[in-house]
């Protein structure tokens, strides 16, 4: 009897110790950039020593590619970003660094998530679409601010021609909405202050401690206030001669040269996607391209990624290979060059400066449409509309029985 009681107690103690050492569940984290901390949620899953971590981009999860917790030592890899979390787990706290050698390592800390009751405050309603006048290096004159709101809670994204900031999430406090975003690749803090004149004052702090201030007006009032329209992503980039077939000839990861004149593309509808594994908006877009390829490849759709990587990735494309594996990419992937070579490697394009950019080729090999950037799910209805328009475009091109030599 004493033996059985002792065995039960020992089992309970072992179980309690295992639970105390378990990371499983939601955690409240911060990552430090320069002199400010960005709060975020992270979720850990654990099976034995194996650990998986997931950051959040709105409702989307950004999961790790591998990880382990051995004794107090926690190591989690996000190979598709070429980043890692290295930390100790002790006394209920995860503490260490996150980052990589190229962009640096940043102090990281997390504690078990504590659900905070919704603030008993009446927040002003700012839901909807806003226009931000801004002159960008890409030639834009305005951006969009897309806001989704539930009471005092906000999820917002700034949508540029190349894509969005990711979901900036937070609550109304002290007369302003205090928001943050961290998905392992993008780090941002934002404050949105509603003004008496109906406008919004925005402070956005991002990578390398950059602080930018903007004013936003309701999109339906922008024209009357003299605020320009945001750039149309369908008009941002064009080709010099739309009557000429779109040409490419680059090596794939095995070293084999693949060209637009290959039999593989003859008489096919082709999506040519300018991309890079360093580009967060390209990560946003990849699952949609995979979905399109899976659905329409048998009907005559080919997708070709023209990938531009930094010199070190071109020598050792481990991040790119992890990117391809992460998203289950089976369409053609070509190493086109370095980001600085974009225009030289695709000389037919005019004003090609957005990552990603997607060219839609008809069965005759000619460019039928070009879309700059990718509005991700954080952009709400703009993401829904983009997916719908792209799908309809592909179906229309596939329905055209044009067969011409390239």
What are these regions, as identified by a protein language model?
Residues 354-406:
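Thiol-/selenol-based redox modules, centered on thioredoxin-like
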Residues 6-15:
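Bacterial N-terminal signal peptides
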Residues 284-327, 339-346:
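Structural microenvironment flanking redox-active thiols in thiol-disulfide oxidoreductases
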Residues 248-270, 293-296:
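A short beta-strand-turn-helix
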Residues 249-251, 321-359, 363:
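Short, internal strand/loop/helix patches
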Residues 268-270, 275-278, 285, 310, ...:
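Short pre-active-site segment immediately N-terminal to redox-active cysteine/selenocysteine motifs
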């Amino acid at each position: 009897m004493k033996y059985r009681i002792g065995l039960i107690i020992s089992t309970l103690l072992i179980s309690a110790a295992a639970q105390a050492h378990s990371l499983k569940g939601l955690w409240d984290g911060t990552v430090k950039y320069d002199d400010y901390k960005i709060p975020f949620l992270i979720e850990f899953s654990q099976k034995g020593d194996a650990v998986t971590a997931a950051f959040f981009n709105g409702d989307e999860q950004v999961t790790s590619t591998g990880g382990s917790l051995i004794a107090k030592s926690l190591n989690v890899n996000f190979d598709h970003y070429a980043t890692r979390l290295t930390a100790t787990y002790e006394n209920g706290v995860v503490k260490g660094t996150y980052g990589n050698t190229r962009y640096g390592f940043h102090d990281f800390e997390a504690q078990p998530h504590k659900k905070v009751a919704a603030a008993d405050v009446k927040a002003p309603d700012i839901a909807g679409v806003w226009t931000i006048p801004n002159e960008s290096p890409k030639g834009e004159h305005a951006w969009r601010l897309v806001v989704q709101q539930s009471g005092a809670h906000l999820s917002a994204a700034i949508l540029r021609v190349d894509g969005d900031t990711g979901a900036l999430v937070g609550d109304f406090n002290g007369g302003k909405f205090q928001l943050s975003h961290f998905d392992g690749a993008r780090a941002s803090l934002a404050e949105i202050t509603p003004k008496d004149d109906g406008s919004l004052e925005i402070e956005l702090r991002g990578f390398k401690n950059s602080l930018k201030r903007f004013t936003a007006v309701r999109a339906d009032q922008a024209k009357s206030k003299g605020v320009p329209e945001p750039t149309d992503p369908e008009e941002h980039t064009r080709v010099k001669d739309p009557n000429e077939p779109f040409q490419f000839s680059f090596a794939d990861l095995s070293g084999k040269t693949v060209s637009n004149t290959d039999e593989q593309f003859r008489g096919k509808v082709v999506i040519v996607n300018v991309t890079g594994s360093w580009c967060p908006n390209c990560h946003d877009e990849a699952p949609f391209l995979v979905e399109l390829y899976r659905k329409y490849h048998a009907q005559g759709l080919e997708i070709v990624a023209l990938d531009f990587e930094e010199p070190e990735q071109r020598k050792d494309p481990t991040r790119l290979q992890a990117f391809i594996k992460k998203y289950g990419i089976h369409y053609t992937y070509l190493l086109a060059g370095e980001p600085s070579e974009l225009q030289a490697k695709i000389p037919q394009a005019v004003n090609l400066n957005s990552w990603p950019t997607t060219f839609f080729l008809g069965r005759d090999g000619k460019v039928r449409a070009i879309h700059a950037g990718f509005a991700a799910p954080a952009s709400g209805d703009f993401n829904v509309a983009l997916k719908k328009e792209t799908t309809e475009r592909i179906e229309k091109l596939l329905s055209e029985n044009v067969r011409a030599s390239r």
